[in-house]
Regions:
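Mid-domain Rossmann-like dinucleotide-binding core that forms the NAD(H)/NADP(H) cofactor-binding site
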Residues: 118-193
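Short amphipathic alpha-helix with an adjacent loop that forms part of the alpha/beta core around
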Residues: 196-206
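Glycine-rich phosphate-binding loop and adjacent beta-alpha segment
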Residues: 219-291, 324-328
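NAD(P)H dinucleotide-binding glycine-rich loop of Rossmann-like/cofactor-binding domains
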Residues: 45, 78, 84-147
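C-terminal capping/lid region of NAD(P)-dependent oxidoreductase domains
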Residues: 289-298, 306-328
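Glycine-rich beta-strand-centered segment in the early N-terminal region that forms part
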Residues: 22-38, 50-92
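Short, glycine/polar-rich helix-capping loops at beta-to-alpha or helix-loop-helix junctions
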Residues: 93-96, 171-179, 196, 244-249
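Short glycine-centered segments of the SAM/dcSAM-binding site in methyltransferase folds
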Residues: 84, 142, 166, 232-233, ...
């Protein structure tokens, strides 16, 4: 089969589509012929050597995919050759085939494109996990979702909206702010020219929010804590703004705040299956009905993965960037 292989050129990663060894699959797994995958920040970091895959996981990039079932393991009864599916992956998505545990698969709606299917698993499950399972977001509460124009952001805004929460968000361009408002954000703040903590406190008459979902990290920590209500939660899912920061424990103790660090990729198979099932019960019907939807910015052929990575690295995308695999 073919897959994207990472090679170094003057310490810069070069992504090449070339022949690699075929993969095997276990009795509880399904072999899927991939039609589309997607670019995530984790892929950019892994390509540069900063985010190695968990032990035992394929070194091939790609944390999600859509495709066609090509073969099933002996223990698999609920999937058949030819089924259209999508799934969260620990790795291996930038390839022609991948092996997936059968309980991680979701059926791709007939009206959906391969690109739409590949735009869902990683970011929608990440947003669901951290807003509703870790963050315990409830109807009537207020949430600040940073990086609202990202894949996780565009998914999170919609799910929070549908759950009955008031949504605030940050983004770095007028286009992204407009899209966030269209998706349901009550207030979209340009972090490049506005103080988001001041804007949030003004918009909430000094009350703040119940939950902050933050992929930025260190540089936002103090402001995030400042705007949280009593018993508020800060869920940290990234370190784009740095790993370290001073913390005012007075805010944490005085308001009984919780700071939660959360990653999806490193969780056990059992945890991922549980998260997938809960997401399917709560939000899959809304996706099928078109009440919420994956936001896709651009689609690249897989042979242009290098250009797709640069596009995401430059923060040009609103929503997901997809890689499609041509079927010969």
């Amino acid at each position: 089969m073919k897959a994207i292989v990472i090679k170094a050129d003057n310490k810069k990663p070069v992504l090449i589509w070339q022949e690699v060894s075929d993969i095997s699959f276990g009795p509880a797994e399904v072999l899927v012929a991939i039609r589309a995958t997607a670019v995530n920040r984790a892929d950019l970091l892994q390509a540069r050597g900063y985010y190695p895959p968990p032990e035992g996981v394929s070194e091939i990039l790609g944390l999600e995919m859509s495709g066609v079932v090509a073969a099933v393991g002996a223990e698999v009864k609920n999937w058949h050759v030819g089924d259209r599916v999508l799934a969260l992956l620990p790795g291996g998505g930038y390839a022609e085939h991948v092996a997936v545990h059968h309980d991680l698969l979701l059926e791709l709606p007939q009206s959906w494109s391969w690109a739409q299917g590949a735009a869902v698993p990683e970011v929608w499950l990440t947003a669901f996990l951290n807003l509703f399972l870790e963050g315990q977001l409830k109807p009537g509460q207020a949430v600040l979702i940073h990086a609202g124009g990202s894949g996780v952001g565009t998914a999170g805004i919609q799910m929070a909206r549908e759950s009955g929460a008031t949504v605030f968000t940050t983004a770095g361009s007028d286009q992204k702010l407009t899209k966030c408002r269209e998706l349901g954000a009550r207030l979209a703040i340009n972090y490049k020219i506005q103080d988001f903590s001041r804007e949030i406190l003004t918009a909430t008459a000094g009350q703040g929010v119940d939950l902050v979902l933050d992929p930025v990290g260190g540089s936002y920590l103090q402001q995030n804590l400042q705007i949280l209500k009593e018993n508020g939660r800060l869920v940290s899912i990234g370190l784009l703004g740095g790993r370290t920061a001073e913390i005012d424990l007075g805010w944490v103790l005085g308001k009984s705040l919780r700071i939660i660090g959360s990653r999806l990729r490193s969780r056990s198979l059992e945890e991922k299956i549980s998260i997938t099932r809960k997401f399917k019960r709560q939000f899959w019907p809304l996706l099928n009905e078109g009440k919420i939807w994956p936001v896709i910015d651009r689609v690249f052929p897989i042979i242009e993965a290098q250009a797709a990575h640069e596009y995401v690295r430059e923060n040009r995308n609103i929503g997901k960037v997809i890689l499609e695999i041509d079927v010969v």
